[in-house]
Structure formats: structure tokens, C-alpha cells
Amino acid sequence: MSTEIPSLSASYANSFKIGAAVHTRMLQTEGEFIAKHYNSVTAENQMKFEEVHPREHEYTFEAADEIVDFAVARGIGVRGHTLVWHNQTPAWMFEDASGGTASREMMLSRLKQHIDTVVGRYKDQIYAWDVVNEAIEDKTDLIMRDTKWLRLLGEDYLVQAFNMAHEADPNALLFYNDYNETDPVKREKIYNLVRSLLDQGAPVHGIGMQGHWNIHGPSMDEIRQAIERYASLDVQLHVTELDLSVFRHEDQRTDLTEPTAEMAELQQKRYEDIFGLFREYRSNITSVTFWGVADNYTWLDNFPVRGRKNWPFVFDTELQPKDSFWRIIGQD
């Protein structure tokens, strides 16, 4: 690894943390690289409900422990992801002993035990938790996503979850996290939800803007308006899952073996503009996490087109800095 390449996180030391989503295999193969460029890590999947709590009386913390131990040993922050989500939650959470629907009381008891155990295990080691993930509906005529959490617990499940997480670790920053967060309609739904939670006294310390964007959109104005709207609630903002796909969402092509020159140039300019904007709001934005480490691995290789390579980050498939890296480095 070239020593002449400056550390990405060090170059933003006066602005915000620079993070990456990781899994345990990466720590073994890319640990030195991760430690050089990132001062925050998020478990991409290995802290999700079904990963750490597959059966009611069984917890599997080996992978999560490995990530936390790696980070703590190197002075790297950890974001916890995620406690309450409609995906990757095991069926037993919503069922009683006979396979019927669990009662509200049973679910609240289970949720508290889960949060107490998971958050409590990493107390004072995880600086922020995505407590509730993606509870807002994308369709314009609905507000809350229709999930088992909502159907069985009612809307106050969010308040309950935040209160439980705060009890388990009073020092952790607690976030509501969502995608399409720059869309004006969904933006207002997220704003109103978090404002309502705050009005109810819920310990919500921040909003997670996922940042699954592409080289064409959303517009810089939409990103700026979302930042300003959320910041007006006087909460911290984290960009939690940043990647810039080289494809529009509706683009189904599968024939590219590398990005076109136009894609690469658009991505460089977008990264430069976006990080300039983030830096402008560094009093509000305290952490920016990429949803991966480098182009050698990204969830976008299988979404929305399965098996299609994507190149969404500032490091290439060989862990070398792309031109976009040099566009955003040294902006502090």
C-alpha cells in the first residue's frame, strides 16, 4: 500500500468522521487499508437482528464482536446498525409459542430484551445506533410503512425503541435512518416523524441520511434542502450509507466491464460537489459513512440488477484511489 496516498479520514479530521460499511472477511484482507482511511465502521449486515439473535434464546455475537474488537483496538468509532427494521428480523419475534401472532406485551418484552442485550453488550464502544430503519412509506399517499412492527405494536413502537436504546446505553447517539431522504415528499414525512418523536420526548439525537444516490441525481439543491430541513430540528446528521452508482436506477444494461469515461467524470464531479456541500454543513453533519470500502465489493453488484458490476466508491477494485478521491481529499 503506497504511503504517499493521504488518509481520507485524516483529511476530514476538522469536519466529520469518515466511515465504511464492513464485514468480517474484509477485516482480514483489508484491515490495514480500512484503518488508514476510515475512522468509523458500520457492520453492513452482521449486527442486524437475525444475525445476532436468530432464535429467541440464542445470540450469535461472534462476527459483531470481531468488528467491534477490530475498531476499538485501533481507535476507530463504530456505528451500530440496526435495532428495528422490517427486513432481516426473524419470524419468531412476531409469533407466540403456538405459531400464532405474538401479543403486544410479548413483543415489547422481546424487543426490550433484544435491545438491552445487544446495545448493552457494546455499551460505550458504539458511538451511535440506527435505532429504527426505514419506517416511512415511499408511496405518497401513505406515511408509515406497513410492517409487522407497526401492525402489532402501533405507531409508538418507535418511541418505545428509542427509550429502550437510551436506557441500555445513555451515552450512545440514537438515529432514525432512511433512504430517498432527499425526495421532497418523503423528506417531509421523515421530518414530521422525527419532530413527532421529539415532541413525545423520545431520545432521538440524529437523522441518518442513507445517501444511496447515483451520478445523475438527486440534485445538489435537493440534497441541500434535505440537510437544511433536518438540521432545523436541531439534531445531528449522519450520512450513513453513501454510494454513487454509475447507473440510473432504471438503467438495466449489463454489458459494461468498466465505467465509461463519461461515468467516471460525472462521478468525480458529483463527489467533489457533494463533499463540498457536506463540509459546508459540518456543524450539522458529524459522520459520513460509505456503504463499502472500495469498488471490489458493493451491494450494488447485485442491486437493482443481480450480478452487474458497479463502481460507486472513491477507491477502485484494487484499493487504489480514483480521481474522485483526489477531488475530495484535502478539502478541509
Swiss-Prot record:
The gene is xynB. Its EC number is 3.2.1.8. GO terms for cellular component: cytoplasm. It is an enzyme of class 3 (hydrolase). Keywords: Carbohydrate metabolism, Cytoplasm, Glycosidase, Hydrolase, Polysaccharide degradation, Xylan degradation. PROSITE patterns: GH10_2. It catalyses: Endohydrolysis of (1->4)-beta-D-xylosidic linkages in xylans. Optimum temperature is 50 degrees Celsius. Loses 100% activity after incubation for 15 minutes at 50 degrees Celsius. Its main location: cytoplasm. Residues 2-331 form the GH10 domain. The keyword Cytoplasm applies. It comes from Paenibacillus barcinonensis. InterPro entries: GH10, GH10_dom, Glycoside_hydrolase_SF. The lineage of its organism: Bacteria, Bacillati, Bacillota, Bacilli, Bacillales. Plays a role in plant xylan biodegradation, probably via the hydrolysis of short xylooligosaccharides resulting from extracellular xylan hydrolysis, once they have been transported inside cells. Shows similar activity on xylans of different rate of arabinose or methylglucuronic substitution. Also displays high activity on aryl-xylosides. Is active on xylotetraose and xylotriose, but does not hydrolyze xylobiose, indicating that XynB is a xylanase and not a beta-xylosidase. Optimum pH is 5.5. Shows more than 75% of maximum activity from pH 5 to 10. Is still active at pH 12. Belongs to the glycosyl hydrolase 10 (cellulase F) family. Cytoplasmic xylanase subfamily. GO terms for molecular function: endo-1,4-beta-xylanase activity. Pathway: Glycan degradation; xylan degradation. The active site is at residues 134, 241. It is found in: Cytoplasm. This is Endo-1,4-beta-xylanase B. GO terms for biological process: xylan catabolic process. The keyword Hydrolase applies. Completely inhibited by Ag(2+), Cu(2+), Hg(2+), Mn(2+), Pb(2+) and Sn(2+). Strongly inhibited by Fe(2+) and Zn(2+). Co(2+) and Ni(2+) cause little inhibition while Ca(2+) and Mg(2+) do not affect enzyme activity, and Ba(2+) produces a small stimulating effect. Irreversibly inactivated by SDS in vitro. It comes from the Bacteria. It holds the Pfam family Glyco_hydro_10.
